[in-house]
Amino acid sequence: MDTSNLVLMRMPLGPLGTNCYVIGDKEQGEAFIIDPATTEVLDALKKHNLKPKAVLLTHGHGDHIGGVQGIVDAYDVPIYIHHNDVKYLSDPELNLSNYSNPTPITVKGRIIEVHEGDHITCGAIDLTVYETPGHTPGGVCYYMPGLVFVGDTLFNQSVGRTDFVEGDYDALINAIKTKLYTLPDNTMVYPGHGPETQIGYEKQYNRFS
């Protein structure tokens, strides 16, 4: 795509500093919001004259979905999430908001279930869905040439926790090795927490994977 029209923003939001991302097409005037912990992300969109086209979720934990309902109520946009994590949106025990948030989080809206290989587009942006279970059974990553949004699957020199309900360490490591580590080494990795990294760097220095 013409990168001169690409908008990419990272905003650590919420009590756990969850990285919320906006990736948009200036010419189209629309953007995807990825893992909104709060609705503060909407202020950033307005500054860039962008409207949300959809909310994309890498998984269903409460620190990644806290702003979804407010965004959906304001803009009536769909919510993309893997079918194995849909139940997290209505269950504060599963999404852990009973423990990590002042009030339990539930989300209602137009759900679009994603699967391996799906393409989600916004203007010239074309994101491919990779199923990467382990942190949750419905964990996914969103990839386009040059970058990948990985949620809590992979971090800078670390990997996502698997000691929560339905976590699976072996599945997580397998997904990282067979899905993410097959991407070009110079692919930028945008995780759910902490700083960005690159695939090649993690293949060399990440002791967990």
Predicted features along the sequence, with ranges:
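Conserved beta-strand hairpin/beta-sheet module of binuclear metal-dependent hydrolase folds
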Residues: 2-51, 141-151
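Short Gly/Pro-enriched turn/cap motifs at secondary-structure boundaries
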Residues: 11-13, 110-111, 131-133
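Short alpha-helical
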Residues: 18, 39-40, 62-63, 87, ...
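Short, glycine/acidic-enriched loop or turn micro-motifs at the edges of active sites
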Residues: 27-28, 38, 62, 85, ...
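Active-site neighborhood of phospho(di)ester-bond hydrolases with catalytic His/Asp-centered motifs
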Residues: 33-34, 53-60, 79-82, 131-134, ...
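Active-site HxH/HxHxD metal-binding segment of metal-dependent hydrolases
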Residues: 38-122, 205-208
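Metallo-beta-lactamase
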Residues: 95-98, 125-209
